[in-house]
Amino acid sequence: MIERIAPGATIGVLGGGQLGRMFGIAARRLGYRVHTYEASPDSPAGQISDREFTGSYTNEAAIAEFVDSVDVITFEFENIPAGVLDWIATKKPIHPRSEVLHICQTREREKTFLHAKGYPIAPFRVVGNEDELRIA
């Protein structure tokens, strides 16, 4: 069960794109503080955040500083090294879990997961080269 995150808490968002911006705007309206972590400064989400952290997703010191500044963490895009989320999960709650990121990082895993759970998806085939594409 997910523990309730009370207004006034600081939510950390990994990624600074438009989705993070919309999330941050909604979270702030509900009374939360928002910190973002993004590779590039002045990101769309960073522009509306209470605090923006900038650095590589492999910069352990910068990630640690970000993690220490928040109560709970989420992510807004899938191009984050899974190991980073695994490390963060040992320090702070992270939602969704890193397993979700792993599934979303490739369309093959994403579609296979959804199909296995019984969700209706369009037929698909995974191809790795031109010969497999011709056969598909």
Predicted region positions:
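ATP-binding N-terminal substructure of ATP-dependent carboxylate-amine bond-forming enzymes
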Residues: 1-105, 109
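Active-site nucleotide/adenylate-binding loops and adjacent lid/helix of ATP-dependent enzymes
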Residues: 103-136
